[in-house]
Amino acid sequence: MNLEVKKIDTANARLSAKLSIENLEKRYDKIAQKIAQKVKIDGFRRGKVPLSLVKTRYQAQIEQDAQEEMIQEVLKNAFKELGIENKDLIGSPNLTKFEKKDTHFEIEADIGLKPTIVLDKIKECVPSVGVEVPNEEKIDERLKQLAKDYAKFVDTNTQRKAQNDDKLTIDFEGFIDNAPFEGGKAENFNLILGSKQMLEDFEKALLGMQAGEEKEFPLTFPSKYHAEHLAGKEAFFKVKLHQIQAREMLEINDELAKIVLANEENATLKLLKERVEGQLFLENKARLYNEELKEKLIENLDEKIVFDLPKTIIEQEMDLLFRNALYSMQAEEVKSLQESQEKAKEKRESFRNDATKSVKITFIIDALAKEEKIGVHDNEVFQTLYYEAMMTGQNPENLIEQYRKNNMLAAVKMAMIEDRVLAYLLDKNLPKEQQEILEKMRPNAQKIQAG
């Protein structure tokens, strides 16, 4: 074996090797013997099949196994020469050449190594942080909203006309070209006027109706309606209003606190205000982080933390971004890329910068998570997916299985870890007085659900 190994930088190495044809052929008998012990061929007892017959019937498999064995031997020798072990690798080596010549094979491969990351400039990367502390006006607004959310709906007299914020019970049926359409009919349907639960023009048409009244009205579906078969269509609806209920507003006092904080002993308005203040502060913090500071922090990490990246991982990320992009392309563009190898190569190359940044940030986040002992339990991943399923009307088990089949659970976990690491760095950079506010509010800022 003629082997040459070159370490390009701390995260990349390259090997080139020449191996004689005999190196491959000498492996055939041993591999054929292993196959002969397992296969069953008519007329022969298991383990008694002649090697010549095995070599003939399983020639392709024998050659493939021999080549794989030879490649593994080359890699083993390369690792030894580099002074590395499997734990030092990142991903699998990328075989860039395996070519058979008259007397030998030529093999070339790129090897990715776990990068060395120095985190001494992290503090320089974290932008200044200042979260808006909720004032009395904001707290009062939230209390009024809670009083509204927890208010009960009560029956009104039959003469009262429907108005915004009323709860209506209706039957309705929609028609297009005088024919009912799918999903356009419901009975005893509850609707809060002004909630945008239905199309705005539909809700407006119900304003002023009285219990027992029936009404017909035209309606044009928006051109970008989520149900494509209805988008832009002219329709008319028949509606019968059965019942109008109005909110019985709650006063903002200790009784409201007992309703909202039902699991609390001795709930008071003062305690509710503290909880609301805490939740508003955390909401302001999350909004500031998600809409502005996390992206700034990522840009700074990318710019200031410098280390060698394994090119094999960048190439894999480019492949992933390219494949994902194909799903959102028009059929004509996909066809164009399929017909032109040069165009496909150029399109894939356009993802290099994004892939490089993504790989780099992932390595940095992973290093920070290990240093600060920040992690995400598998149950937290499942809870996140359960919430996603609930919000999108999907079956949670089916969604989790879909993520599992597509090997996406690890990506979800990594995204959650990234979110926690970035928030941790930003929290540490809060002004001292706001860090104190945060520590004080965290225990008291339980999620207050709408009624």
UniProtKB/Swiss-Prot annotation:
One of its GO terms (biological process) is 'de novo' cotranslational protein folding. Disulfide bonds: none annotated. This is Trigger factor. The keyword Cell division applies. Residues 165-250 form the PPIase FKBP-type domain. GO terms for cellular component: cytoplasm. NCBIfam families: tig (TIGR00115). It comes from Helicobacter pylori (strain ATCC 700392 / 26695) (Campylobacter pylori). InterPro entries: PPIase_dom_sf, PPIase_FKBP_dom, Trig_fac, Trigger_fac_C, Trigger_fac_C_sf, Trigger_fac_ribosome-bd_bac, Trigger_fac_ribosome-bd_sf, Trigger_fact/SurA_dom_sf. PANTHER family: TRIGGER FACTOR CHAPERONE AND PEPTIDYL-PROLYL CIS/TRANS ISOMERASE, TRIGGER FACTOR-LIKE PROTEIN TIG, CHLOROPLASTIC.
